[in-house]
C-alpha cells in the first residue's frame, strides 16, 4: 500500500463501500504509506501480514489462506496480478487488472475480471479472456483544488506525478526533451517530479548530465492532499509513459483545470479523447515531446478548452461511480437475499 494512484483510489472505493457493506482490507507486504491509512474509514477492518518484500516465507502464505478460510468472505477482490497463485482457498475471486503489457496470468476461481480501460480490456481479449468487463477508474474530484486563471507565470511551470520507473513512466523521455528545449535557448521553464521509485538515482544522474539542475526539482513522495492542493499551481501536466493502462494522474490534473500533455498510448490518450481535451505526442519520441511542450508554451489553451476538459473528465471518471459499479458486480456474483 504505497502512495500510488491505484492505492489511493482503492481507499476512496473502500470509503464508499463501507457505507453499504462490511469491508476488510488485507495488506500482505510490510510496505505501506501512513498517509494512505490515515484516510481509510475506521469501519474498514485492516489485517496486516507484514511480509518482507521479496520474501518466500511459506508461513506468510499459510497465514494468508487461513485468514480467508476463517472469515468466509462473500467476495475476495484482488488488485495484485500474482496473488492468485498463492491462494488455495476457493472463494468468489474478483480481480482488477490495472495495466497493459501484462503477461497472461492465472484466473482460476475468478467470478469477475475488471479492466480499468478499453486498452486493458482489448489486451485481455487478445489473450483469450472474453469475460472481463470494463469499469473505469475514478477520482474524487471534490478534493482537488482548481486553477481559476489562464497561464500567467513568468516561468512556465510543469509537473509530472508518478512512480519513478523509466521502463513504464518514461521520465527519461521528458528530461531529454527539456534538454533539447534548453539547447534551443528556451530556458524559462521549471519541472517538478513528484514521486519515488527504483530509477530515482538514474533520474538524478540524467538531470545532472543534461545540465538541468536549475530547471528540474525532485519533490519525492508527497501525500495526496499535497498533490491535490498544488496541481493548480502549474501550467502543464506531462505524462510521458511508454505504456499505461489508464493514467489516473492525468485525470486528476484535468480535475485541477490545468492542461495535460500525454504520450500517444493506451489509457492516457483515451482520457483526453485522442486530443480533444488535451495534447499528445508520439509515444517514446523525445523530439515529439519537446516539440509539443514548446507548442503549448507558445499557444496556451483557452479557458473554454480547459473547462471543457474538466467537464469531460469529471463526468466520465467519478470514483463514486466506480465504487458503485464494483458493488453492482459483487451483487451479481452473490445476489442479495
Regions found by a protein language model. Name each.
Residues 1-4, 8-56, 197-199:
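N-terminal strand-loop element at the rim of the active site
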Residues 242:
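Aromatic "clamp/platform" in nucleotide-sugar-dependent glycosyltransferases that forms part
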Residues 302-316, 325-328, 332:
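A short, well-ordered alpha-helix in the C-terminal region of glycosyltransferases
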Residues 204-222:
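Nucleotide-activated donor-binding/catalytic signature segment of Leloir-type glycosyltransferases, i.e.
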Residues 119, 138:
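Carbohydrate-associated surface elements
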Residues 274-275, 279-286, 295-300:
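Conserved acidic donor-binding segment of nucleotide-sugar-dependent glycosyltransferases
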Amino acid at each position: 500500500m504505497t502512495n500510488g494512484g491505484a492505492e489511493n483510489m482503492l481507499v476512496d472505493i473502500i470509503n464508499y463501500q463501507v457505507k453499504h457493506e462490511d469491508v476488510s482490507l488485507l495488506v500482505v507486504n510490510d510496505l505501506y504509506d501512513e498517509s494512505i491509512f490515515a484516510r481509510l474509514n475506521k469501519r474498514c477492518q485492516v489485517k496486516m501480514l507484514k511480509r518482507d518484500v521479496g520474501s518466500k516465507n511459506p508461513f506468510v502464505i499459510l497465514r494468508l489462506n487461513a485468514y480467508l478460510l476463517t472469515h468466509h468472505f462473500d467476495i475476495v477482490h484482488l488488485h495484485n496480478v500474482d496473488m492468485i497463485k498463492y491462494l488455495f482457498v476457493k472463494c468468489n475471486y474478483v480481480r482488477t487488472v490495472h495495466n497493459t503489457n501484462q503477461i497472461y496470468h492465472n484466473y482460476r476461481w475468478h467470478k469477475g475480471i475488471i479492466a480499468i480501460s478499453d486498452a486493458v480490456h482489448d489486451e485481455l481479449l487478445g489473450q483469450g479472456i472474453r469475460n472481463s468487463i470494463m469499469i473505469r477508474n475514478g477520482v474524487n474530484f471534490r478534493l482537488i483544488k482548481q486553477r481559476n486563471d489562464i497561464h500567467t507565470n513568468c516561468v512556465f511551470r510543469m509537473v509530472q506525478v508518478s512512480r519513478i520507473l523509466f521502463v513504464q513512466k518514461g521520465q527519461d523521455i521528458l528530461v531529454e526533451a527539456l534538454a533539447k528545449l534548453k539547447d534551443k535557448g528556451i530556458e524559462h521553464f521549471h519541472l517538478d517530479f513528484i514521486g519515488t521509485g527504483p530509477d530515482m538515482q538514474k533520474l538524478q544522474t540524467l538531470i545532472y548530465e543534461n545540465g538541468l539542475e536549475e530547471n528540474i526539482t525532485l519533490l519525492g513522495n508527497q501525500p495526496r492532499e499535497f498533490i491535490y492542493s498544488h496541481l493548480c499551481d502549474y501550467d502543464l501536466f506531462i505524462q510521458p509513459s511508454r505504456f499505461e493502462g489508464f493514467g489516473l494522474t492525468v485525470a486528476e490534473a484535468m480535475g485541477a483545470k490545468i492542461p495535460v500533455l500525454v504520450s500517444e498510448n493506451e489509457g492516457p490518450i483515451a482520457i483526453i479523447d485522442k486530443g480533444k481535451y488535451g495534447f499528445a505526442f508520439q509515444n517514446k519520441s523525445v523530439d515529439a515531446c519537446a516539440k509539443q511542450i514548446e507548442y503549448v508554451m507558445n499557444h496556451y489553451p483557452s479557458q473554454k478548452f480547459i473547462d471543457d476538459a474538466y467537464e469531460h473528465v469529471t463526468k466520465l471518471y467519478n470514483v463514486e461511480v466506480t465504487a458503485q459499479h464494483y458493488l453492482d458486480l459483487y451483487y451479481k456474483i452473490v445476489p442479495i437475499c
